[in-house]
């Protein structure tokens, strides 16, 4: 062992050793319990950033800790490798997406290994590899056979910059979540997964996720958006057509004074044909259709009268039909009944267009609401009025009564509605999983047979965005034979949303080299579900919801034995610098490579883990990094000075009664074992765990420096030093490995059993208590531990120093707090 801490030499040495010895390869089956620790896999952009370092360092501590606790830990890593950035980079640099992606993977893999992460690299996956996306195509076919996959002509979100369709979940405030371009609306034939079939199960099973943050569950609950109400049918006057609306307030149906349709509602053209309002309505529709959803829902509410009426099925009233910008066709039924007296938006719209207002709910039977006095809609509960047979009913009871009446009369029904829409998976881009479908004039839409998978993604493609799939430009890909009749056919040229790839990768890790199955069910049964999942809260809806959906589908297909993929979820905070998220545009990016080169991977890990609790944002601090580096140097110097004593030390005696400084050293050691174990295994309070290790190191320095070498108990000293190294191992694996070897131990420190504390060693002989006079601390004194209140009071009051503090003052009251303080109230 060198006197100087040469982190570069040490980290290189042990990384090579771990790689050579396959230290982190885990067997699929053994007698040990299993633990599956997984961090969300990265997109191979080419460079790690500090957010990656934080995410993977957190996971690595958990994985190493669980391994030392006696678990077989599955801790894999892979690459979410398909997607638009590869195409955009390829266009910019004139390099094929595959070449760019694989080069980036090689570089980032090297960076991850430099961090000393305990991944089983034998399980590595890349979603762009044929042996991965072959099984993605196979899973598509399973959903297709189950009726959960379909194609339809749909109005979709279109990103003009990315030149592709976006799922609803990928549109944030009317903009593309990836490039921030304003999203447009477009009509296209698209493939969908029927996630709505699982809406209620996805909602119900949120209660099973006790290890998930509440905020994530609330976000999913709101996105699924369950609402109970009724579908009511209004007949169009003078027509066989009808309009169906969904409402959560059927108790207000007698207050309907107008009907509003979405501009893209298919009934609009029929309603206005030949009417005087036709030209005006067409102009309005064309103008609104150019707007984004955000513009439509956030701007002023605008509408236009169609000239048509429908009939309220409850009271026969004529209801004017309007078109409005704020009604979206893909939400609900694309039609909304206007009840201005009891809905604020409807109230404002009615005032703007001088539409009638009908009050049908009073606060109480004797509290009338006059329309001319209304300044806003009355939206609270009350008593139904002007509502025919329902007059006098409390409106909450009225909801059930109206639904029952509607069902009996055949004019409506009770229904549960969801905000969630089916998952749009088609993308008009090249770098993605080809959809395994062919189109035959004779046979129609035909799935590719499983034995013909994978449908290989061609490498020589002109992939510049044109609005059509680049694969259309490869005739040798497009033109094929029909699997059913053998006649000419054409392949589907859209590729799948990359979220399809990332919604099942956690299962592929369980048998990533399997060529016969997407995963070996026996292995999946052993490892699933993921015990600890770690990633950013930005994935709360998209990735996590889709993964939950896939797992439930796979359960129904008999492919897995679990219905939820992730038992526990940790959403780590961001890494900030100068109060802002690191970004090139702000010039505040800190390179992990530079930090590792200057201070070492162990220092980078220690700072990241010590600076803030995992779920909180972390403010980057150069001084904090230097402080972590100084601490590791301090540990190194301590062990270097004691290595010979530690290496030849006897074991702790079970019969020896340790007293004085030796007992205190043992107490510090076992307190650290207890505290670090609690912090790491509980809420992942790594910052306080590291702080406790620092306190233990201080205690060992004190023991070394204040106790002469001949008087030191080498068994106590060795216990303290060895414990420090083991406790440090999950956080700073390289230095811990080197120190373990230097103190005479065989084998890897990471294969050592985790420590258990000795409760007897935690018992203190003395405790320090504060003596207060009128609430102010005047003295701190050591007294025997575990004294009862009366004993402590008498012991302290008999001490000369306390008598001097009281002097000739009159004692009014004495308040003893055992083991902590004695407050003496005097006057």
Swiss-Prot record:
InterPro entries given in the database record: aa-tRNA-synth_I_CS, aa-tRNA-synth_Ia, Leu-tRNA-ligase, Leu_tRNA-synth_edit, M/V/L/I-tRNA-synth_anticd-bd, Methionyl/Leucyl_tRNA_Synth, Rossmann-like_a/b/a_fold, tRNAsynth_Ia_anticodon-bd
Q: Where in the cell is it found?
A: Cytoplasm
Biological process GO terms, please?
Answer: leucyl-tRNA aminoacylation
Keyword Ligase belongs to the record: yes
Question: One Pfam family this chain carries?
Answer: tRNA-synt_1
Record-level GO cellular component terms:
cytosol
The EC number of this protein is 6.1.1.4
Reaction(s) the record says it catalyses? tRNA(Leu) + L-leucine + ATP = L-leucyl-tRNA(Leu) + AMP + diphosphate
Motif 'KMSKS' region, chain ranges: 581-585
The lineage's top-level taxon is Bacteria
Gene3D superfamilies per the UniProt record, alphabetical? 3.10.20.590, HUPs (3.40.50.620), Isoleucyl-tRNA Synthetase, Domain 1 (1.10.730.10)
Q: Which NCBIfam families match?
A: leuS_bact
The name this protein carries in UniProt is Leucine--tRNA ligase
Q: Which organism is it from?
A: Desulforamulus reducens (strain ATCC BAA-1160 / DSM 100696 / MI-1) (Desulfotomaculum reducens)
């Amino acid at each position: 062992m060198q006197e100087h801490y040469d982190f570069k030499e040490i980290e290189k040495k042990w990384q090579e050793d771990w790689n050579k010895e396959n230290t982190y390869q885990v067997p699929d089956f053994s007698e040990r319990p299993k633990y599956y620790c997984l961090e969300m896999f990265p997109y191979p952009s080419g460079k790690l950033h500090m957010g990656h370092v934080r995410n993977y360092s957190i996971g690595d501590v958990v994985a190493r800790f669980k391994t030392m606790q006696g678990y077989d830990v599955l801790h894999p890593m892979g690459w979410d490798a398909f997607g638009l950035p590869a195409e955009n980079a390829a266009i910019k640099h004139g390099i094929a997406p595959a070449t760019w992606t694989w080069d980036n993977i090689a570089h980032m893999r090297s960076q991850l290994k430099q961090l000393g992460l305990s991944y089983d690299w034998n399980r590595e996956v890349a979603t762009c590899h044929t042996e991965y996306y072959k099984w993605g195509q196979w899973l598509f076919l399973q959903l297709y056979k189950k009726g959960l996959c379909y194609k339809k002509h749909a109005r979709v979100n279109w990103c003009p910059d990315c030149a592709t369709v976006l799922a609803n979940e990928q549109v944030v405030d009317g903009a593309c979540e990836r490039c921030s371009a304003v999203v447009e609306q477009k009509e296209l034939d698209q493939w969908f997964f029927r996630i709505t079939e699982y809406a209620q199960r996805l909602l119900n099973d949120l209660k099973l996720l006790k290890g998930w943050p509440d905020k994530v569950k609330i976000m999913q609950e709101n996105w699924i958006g369950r609402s109970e109400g009724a579908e009511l049918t209004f007949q169009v006057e003078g027509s066989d057509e009808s309009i169906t609306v969904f409402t959560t307030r059927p108790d207000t149906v007698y207050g309907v004074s107008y009907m509003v349709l979405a501009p893209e509602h298919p009934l609009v053209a029929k309603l206005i044909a030949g009417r005087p309002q036709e030209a005006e309505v067409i102009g309005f529709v064309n103008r609104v259709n150019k707007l984004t959803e955000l513009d439509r829902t956030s701007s002023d509410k605008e509408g236009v009268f169609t000239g048509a009426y429908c009939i309220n099925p409850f009271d026969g009233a004529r209801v004017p039909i309007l078109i409005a910008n704020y009604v979206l066709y893909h939400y609900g039924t694309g039609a909304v009944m206007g009840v201005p007296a009891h809905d604020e938006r409807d109230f404002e719209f009615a005032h703007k267009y001088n539409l009638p207002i009908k009050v049908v709910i009073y606060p109480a039977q004797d509290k009338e609401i006059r329309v001319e006095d209304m300044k806003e809609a009355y939206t609270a509960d009350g008593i139904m009025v002007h509502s025919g047979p329902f007059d006098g009913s409390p409106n909450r009871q009225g909801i059930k009564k109206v639904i029952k009446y509607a069902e009996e009369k055949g004019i409506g029904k009770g229904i549960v509605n969801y905000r969630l829409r089916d998952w749009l998976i088609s993308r008009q881009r090249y770098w993605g999983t080809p959809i395994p479908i062919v189109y035959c004039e004779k046979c129609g839409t035909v799935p590719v047979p499983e034995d013909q998978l994978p449908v290989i993604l061609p490498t020589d493609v002109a992939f510049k965005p044109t609005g059509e799939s680049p694969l259309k430009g490869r005739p040798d890909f497009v033109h094929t034979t029909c699997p059913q009749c053998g006649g000419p056919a054409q392949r589907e040229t859209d590729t799948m949303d990359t979220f399809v790839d990332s919604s099942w990768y956690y299962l592929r890790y369980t048998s990533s080299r399997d060529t016969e199955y997407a995963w070996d069910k026996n292995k999946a049964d052993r490892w699933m579900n993921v015990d600890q999942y770690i990633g950013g809260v930005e994935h709360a809806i998209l990735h996590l919801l889709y993964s939950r959906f896939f797992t439930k589908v796979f359960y129904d297909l008999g492919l897995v034995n679990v219905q939820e993929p992730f038992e526990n979820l940790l959403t780590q905070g961001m890494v900030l610098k100068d109060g802002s998220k690191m970004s090139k545009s702000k010039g505040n990016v800190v390179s992990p490579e530079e930090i590792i080169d200057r201070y070492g991977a162990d220092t980078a890990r220690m700072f990241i883990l010590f600076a803030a609790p995992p779920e909180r944002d972390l403010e980057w601090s150069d001084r904090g990094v230097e402080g972590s580096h100084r601490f590791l140097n301090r540990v190194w110097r301590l062990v270097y000075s004691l290595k010979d004593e530690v290496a030849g030390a006897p074991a702790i005696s079970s019969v020896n009664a340790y007293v004085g400084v030796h007992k205190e050293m043992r107490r510090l050691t076992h307190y650290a074992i207890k505290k670090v174990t609690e912090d790491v295994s509980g809420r992942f309070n790594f910052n306080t765990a590291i702080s406790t290790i620092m306190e233990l190191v201080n205690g060992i320095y004190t023991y070394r420096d204040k106790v002469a070498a001949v008087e030191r108990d080498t068994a106590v000293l060795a216990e303290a030093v060895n414990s420090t190294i083991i406790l440090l191992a999950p956080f700073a694996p390289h230095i811990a490995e080197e120190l373990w070897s230097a103190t005479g131990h065989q084998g890897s420190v990471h294969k050592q059993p985790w420590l258990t504390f000795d409760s007897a060693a935690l018992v203190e002989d003395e405790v320090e208590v504060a003596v207060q006079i009128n609430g102010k601390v005047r003295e701190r004194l050591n007294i025997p531990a575990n004294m009862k209140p009366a004993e402590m009071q008498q012991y302290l009051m008999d001490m000369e120093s306390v008598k001097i503090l009281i002097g000739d003052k009159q004692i009014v009251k004495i308040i003893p707090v055992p083991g902590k303080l004695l407050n003496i109230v005097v006057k």
